[in-house]
Amino acid sequence: MPSIYLNIIMAFSIAMVGVLVYRSHMMSSLLCLEGMMLSLFILSTLMILSMHFTMAMMMPIILMVFAACEAAVGLALLVMVSNTYGLDHVQNLNLLQC
């Protein structure tokens, strides 16, 4: 396995640890989730290109579309929560209440 794959897997792992460590702030969690999605995009693109698997060439593009939608929804929730409560602490919120 080339070292580029190990570096990307390590970047994904560090971003996942970041989600677990910085889960009290919504903005930090969103940034770590974006790092995870970016490393998945790069890893899937490299795997598809190295294996010459032409049937799955659309998968990284679809992954980026879902990442963009996730970022838009996350930022909209961040704006709504910060306007309503004045903070972005996830632990102080109960989003199940109306």
Swiss-Prot record:
Main location: mitochondrion
Annotated compartments: Mitochondrion inner membrane
Transmembrane residue ranges: 1-21, 29-49, 61-81
InterPro entries: NADH_UbQ_OxRdtase_chain4L/K, NUOK/Mnh_C1-like
EC number(s) reported in the record: 7.1.1.2
UniProt topology in membrane: Multi-pass membrane protein
Gene Ontology MF: a single term: NADH dehydrogenase (ubiquinone) activity
Gene3D superfamilies per record: 1.10.287.3510
Keyword tRNA-binding attached: no
Record's catalysed reaction(s): a ubiquinone + NADH + 5 H(+)(in) = a ubiquinol + NAD(+) + 4 H(+)(out)
Functional note: Core subunit of the mitochondrial membrane respiratory chain NADH dehydrogenase (Complex I) which catalyzes electron transfer from NADH through the respiratory chain, using ubiquinone as an electron acceptor. Part of the enzyme membrane arm which is embedded in the lipid bilayer and involved in proton translocation.
Subunit text: Core subunit of respiratory chain NADH dehydrogenase (Complex I) which is composed of 45 different subunits.
Protein name as catalogued: NADH-ubiquinone oxidoreductase chain 4L
Organism of derivation: Dasypus novemcinctus
